[in-house]
Every structure is written in C-alpha cells, then in structure tokens.
C-alpha cells in the first residue's frame, strides 16, 4: 500500500476494541512495582543516567551505565517481559495469515533498519569522533552554530563499538515513571497517580499533547515535572517525557481496553496475532516504508512479537535479546513434530490423545471458570459421540468451546441435516481428546445449567464425574429460541463451523423447527438470554488457545 496519512487515533481505538479480551486491570501491580523501585533504587544513580541521556554524544561507558541501571530496575519489577521466542505454524493461524504476518515483519524490519542508518539501535547514524567534529564544522559553515537547533531539538548520537548492546535498553515503564515523579519531584504517590489518571482519561478520547499537559498541570501540579520537549527516539525510561506519562496514565484507567495493559502468554499468542490481523484488514492498516516514528499498528506488532510472554508495553524488557523479527519466526514448511519416545517395559502408558503440555493448557483454561457463577453447558451430537461442546459463564463472558470428529459418520450426516449444520470436512482436523479433558478438569461439585439435561448427564457420568450436578431449565423448544436471531446477529463471528444447510423437521401438531443451525455456544447464550429476559452486555472470551482446537494440518501425513 502506498504511503498516506495515517488516522492514528482511529487505528488505536480499533485495536483497543479488537484486543479487549487480552487487556487487564494493572493499576495495583504498577503501583506495587513503583513502590519497590522507590524503596530499593539509588536515585543518585538515576539522576546520573538522566544526565547521560541529555548529552549530545554518548559513549560505551554511558551505555554500560544505562544497561547496569536497567538490570537493577528489572530485578525489582514483577511486571516484565521474559525471553520467549515463538515459532508460528499453520494451525491457529492460516497459511495466508502467516504469510501476511511474515511480510509485515519484514517490512517493519526494513523500515527500522533504514531509519537507523543500517546499524541497529543507532538512530541518525553511528558517527565516529572524527565524523562528529567534521559535522560540527559543516554546521558552522551553513550557519548552524552550537546555539542553533533544528527540528525538534538536539540529535542524540551514540558512539559505541557494539551497537547491538543498545537493543531493548530504551522505552518507558509506568512503574519507573511513577517512581521518578514521586521521588525526584517531591510529590506524594497519590498525587502522582491522580495526575496521571487525568492524563489517562484524556488518552481514552485523543492523544494528549503539550497544550493538554499544560492545562492539566494547573489542576495537578505533579505533572509539571514532565518535560515540555517533543518525544525523541532512543530516549530512556528515566526521562519524564509526555509519551512516558501518557503510557503510565493508561495503566491507571481500569477500563477503556487500553493496549498498554495487554499481557502476553504463549498459549494465547496466536489468538492475539489473529485478532490483530483481523483489525488490521478491517481498518486497512499497513506498515509504512518511510519515517522514524511507528504508526499504531507497527508499534503494536513490534511489541507483541518481541516476546511471547509478559507485558509488551509496560513491562521491563531490557533483558530480552533480539528484535521482534528475530524472536517471532514463521515456519511455512511445517516440519513433522518429533515422535515421542517409546514406552519402556513396565512404564506408564499414556492413552490420552493429548500431550502433557496440552492437558496443562486445558487445566489452566478450566481453572479460569468460577464455580460460583452460573455455568451453561450444551453439546451437539449424542452423549456417546459428541461433536461439539460449549461451556459458558454469562456474567464474565468466559467460555470453553471445542469440536470433535464423529465416529459414526452416517448418523452425523443426519444430525447435520436436521440440527447442527456441521460438515464432516470441517471437523477432520479437530483435535481429539478436548471434550474429555475439559470434563475431567471441571471443579469438584460444580453445578452446570442446561436446556435438556439427559444427554449432558450421560456425558458427565461416562467420565466418572458423579460429583457434578446438572440443572435442567426445561424450556419449551419454541420458548428456548426466542432470542435466536438477535444472538446470531450479534455473536455470529464466534461461530465459523456451522455452515451446512439445515432442513426443517416435520412433526404432527408441533410448530415447524428452526432452520438456523444449532451451535452449542450460541445455544448457551440464547438460553441464558431467555432465562434472564435480555442479552447480556458482556463480550464472550474463549479460554482455550486456538492453536489447541485443531491439529496442525501441515503435519498430517496422507497414506
């Protein structure tokens, strides 16, 4: 796409909405880290690092001091990104999505390297002492003496031997920003939090600028410690820039789906990237080819792909090695996974189709369900051969939703035609064992709510879970589907597999059945709406990583 004006805030808002499932309240954790920094960090050394960052020319010794300070801060923080390189294969992401991600990372790499003058971490050129002196003479020649600045201020230059040591040593952290404003500004932390909260509220509707900062400073004097200079590239988190303050303010807002509060975890990496690409294509976002500053999509993409675990925006990342394109790799060849070692004589035999790691992911997902909340359950297919399971908690929006390939394909086709509309070809790659793993992992004594409980109770008993109770709401078929169309209109993107044609069943004396496919998840949502009388204003959130739902089709061998 050719270069054009970027509607930055509109893109930011779109990304906030699209990634709202992965944003979290972080205010308490940020303040906790800020207190730890204040209690243990030597702020005399902090002042020296801030002085270094104001120098026009910085050397190897300056970089060493910055790295040492970053290491101390990292050790004090609980919110950090850890080194977790990711290899993405077809499965959770389609081949087209992998190709798109790979292309965007390559474009971003070229843009960053171009802006750095070919040397990673060194913006505006990595000039030697001789070149610096020569540049000074040339500036005098063209009328730009030492007292004459151009553009947005001084060009800061690093004159270091190994510029790769600069990677990931910059960028602000809200906990550090709050600590510096409190300790060095002589303010109470409560005043700082209040001031930054005001800045964060402005950020929910626009990018705060220096004029906004000046006006807010009248009500919150603590904000006067924020520099009035324009933000610069390669500036450390110890400098109290406006962008650092805005980031900290975003963390003080428990709401607004702020991108700054995203937390990455390996199981959810593909899900988050998939959501990002969907928003990108809907809003026609792109990676530009010119300029130093990153647009919102570029900024998000870089931060997410730098590490698959931790806080990409607000955590300490100074101990991470490599750049985003180094740490997130795309494997389009799909090499077969290594076969497990044979079971030794007398050793335990694992009959589960899931690996230990996959079972752990299911257990982690199920543990996020609250035993105290209303929990709906529904299946498609008979209890002995289910093809779909959904468990939904309407108060939080959390749900578990998975599929299973049927054993009895003939019976499945009849069920598809008259009920669920699932197609056999769409279930061939469904990962086996998920339904059993979910039921086994449910909390002891959990109460499940269902519309029609016979098949659910059979399924539960088949897994030996006599401790689980199933409550049947016993709605009539017609009453149960009062909210069917509104639910499908609103939540249709959650259901992508029920694409087959459904035919009405003809029963004497009964109203004609619906020709909408029966989706276990949609049914749970509409049954809850029928019981409560309204569709809840909560966004459903899948707890199972999408990588786990289906087998890697590139690893399948056709014999």
UniProtKB/Swiss-Prot annotation:
Which Pfam families does the entry mention? Answer: Arena_ncap_C, Arena_nucleocap
Site residues by UniProt (Important for exonuclease activity): 455
Query: What GO terms in the biological process aspect are recorded for it?
Result: negative stranded viral RNA replication; RNA-templated viral transcription; symbiont-mediated suppression of host cytoplasmic pattern recognition receptor signaling pathway via inhibition of IKBKE activity
Kindly indicate whether the keyword Protease belongs to this entry.
no
Q: Where on this chain does Mn(2+) bind?
A: 378, 380, 523
GO molecular-function term, one example from the UniProt record: hydrolase activity
Q: Name one GO cellular component term.
A: host cell cytoplasm
What UniProt keywords apply to this chain's record, in alphabetical order?
Answer: Capsid protein, Helical capsid protein, Host cytoplasm, Host-virus interaction, Hydrolase, Inhibition of host IKBKE by virus, Inhibition of host innate immune response by virus, Inhibition of host RLR pathway by virus, Interferon antiviral system evasion, Manganese, Metal-binding, Ribonucleoprotein, RNA-binding, Viral immunoevasion, Viral nucleoprotein, Virion, Zinc
Give the EC number(s) listed in the UniProt record.
Answer: 3.1.13.-
Q: Does the keyword Lipoprotein apply?
A: no
Q: Where in the cell is it found?
A: Virion; Host cytoplasm
Q: Where is this region: Binding site for the cap structure m7GTP?
A: 53-235
Question: Major location, coarse class?
Answer: virion
| Comment block on domains | The N-terminal region is important for the cap-binding activity while the C-terminal region contains the 3'-5' exoribonuclease activity. A CCHE zinc binding site is present in the C-terminal region and may thus contribute to the substrate binding and/or the specificity of the exonuclease activity.
What's this chain's function?
Encapsidates the genome, protecting it from nucleases. The encapsidated genomic RNA is termed the nucleocapsid (NC). Serves as template for viral transcription and replication. The increased presence of protein N in host cell does not seem to trigger the switch from transcription to replication as observed in other negative strain RNA viruses.
Q: How does it assemble?
A: Homomultimerizes to form the nucleocapsid. Binds to viral genomic RNA. Interacts with glycoprotein G2. Interacts with protein Z; this interaction probably directs the encapsidated genome to budding sites. Interacts with protein L; this interaction does not interfere with Z-L interaction. Interacts with host IKBKE (via Protein kinase domain); the interaction inhibits IKBKE kinase activity.
Say which family it is in: Belongs to the arenaviridae nucleocapsid protein family.
Protein's UniProt name: Nucleoprotein
Q: What is the lineage of its organism?
A: Viruses, Riboviria, Orthornavirae, Negarnaviricota, Polyploviricotina
- Name the gene: N
């Amino acid at each position: 796409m050719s270069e054009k004006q970027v509607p930055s805030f509109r893109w930011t808002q779109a990304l906030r909405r699209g990634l709202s499932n992965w944003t979290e309240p972080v205010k308490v954790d940020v303040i906790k880290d800020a207190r730890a920094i204040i209690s243990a960090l030597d702020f005399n050394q902090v002042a020296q690092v801030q002085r270094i960052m104001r120098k026009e020319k910085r050397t190897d010794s300056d970089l060493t001091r910055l790295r040492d300070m970053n290491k101390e801060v990292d050790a004090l923080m609980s919110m950090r990104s850890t080194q977790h390189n990711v290899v993405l294969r077809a499965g959770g992401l389609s081949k087209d999505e992998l190709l798109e991600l790979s292309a965007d990372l390559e474009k971003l790499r070229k843009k960053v390297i171009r802006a750095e003058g070919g040397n990673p971490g060194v913006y505006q050129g990595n000039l030697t002492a001789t070149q610096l002196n020569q540049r000074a003479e040339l500036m005098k020649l063209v009328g730009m003496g030492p007292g004459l600045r151009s553009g947005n201020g001084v060009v800061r230059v690093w004159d270091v031997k190994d510029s790769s040591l600069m990677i990931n040593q910059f960028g602000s952290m809200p906990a550090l920003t709050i600590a510096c404003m409190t300790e060095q500004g002589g303010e109470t932390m409560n005043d700082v939090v209040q001031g930054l909260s005001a800045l964060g509220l402005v950020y929910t509707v626009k990018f705060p600028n220096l004029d906004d900062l000046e006006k807010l400073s009248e009500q919150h004097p603590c904000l006067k410690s924020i520099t009035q200079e324009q933000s610069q590239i390669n500036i450390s988190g110890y400098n109290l820039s406006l962008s650092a303050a805005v980031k900290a303010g975003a963390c003080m807002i428990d709401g607004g789906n702020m991108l700054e509060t995203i937390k990455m975890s390996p199981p959810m990496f593909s899900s988050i990237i998939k959501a990002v690409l969907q928003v990108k294509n809907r809003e026609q976002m792109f990676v530009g080819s010119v300029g130093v500053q990153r647009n919102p999509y570029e900024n998000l993409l870089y931060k997410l792909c730098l590490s698959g675990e931790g806080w990409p925006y607000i955590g300490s990342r100074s101990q991470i090695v490599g750049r985003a394109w180094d740490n997130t790799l795309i494997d389009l060849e799909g090499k077969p996974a290594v076969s497990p070692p044979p079971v030794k004589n007398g050793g335990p035999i694992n009959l589960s189709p899931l690996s230990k790691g996959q079972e752990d992911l299911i257990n982690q997902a199920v543990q996020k369900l609250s035993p105290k909340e209303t929990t709906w359950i529904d299946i498609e297919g008979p209890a002995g051969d289910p093809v779909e399971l959904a468990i939904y908690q309407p108060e939080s929006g959390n749900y578990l939703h998975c599929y299973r390939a049927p054993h009895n394909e003939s019976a499945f086709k009849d069920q598809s035609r008259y009920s669920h509309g699932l197609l056999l070809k769409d279930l061939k790659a469904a990962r086996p064992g998920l339904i059993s793993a979910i039921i086994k992992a449910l909390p002891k004594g959990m109460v499940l709510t269902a519309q029609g409980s016979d098949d659910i109770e059979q399924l539960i008993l088949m897994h030996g879970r006599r401790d689980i109770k199933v409550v049947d709401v016993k709605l009539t078929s017609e009453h149960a589907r009062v909210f069917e169309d509104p639910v499908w209109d609103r939540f249709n993107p959650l259901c992508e597999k029920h694409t087959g044609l459904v035919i009405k069943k003809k029963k004497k004396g009964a109203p004609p059945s619906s020709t909408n496919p029966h989706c276990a998840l949609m049914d749970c949502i509409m049954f809850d709406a029928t019981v409560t009388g309204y569709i809840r204003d909560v966004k459903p959130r899948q707890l199972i990583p999408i990588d786990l739902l289906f087998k890697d089709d590139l690893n399948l061998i056709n014999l």
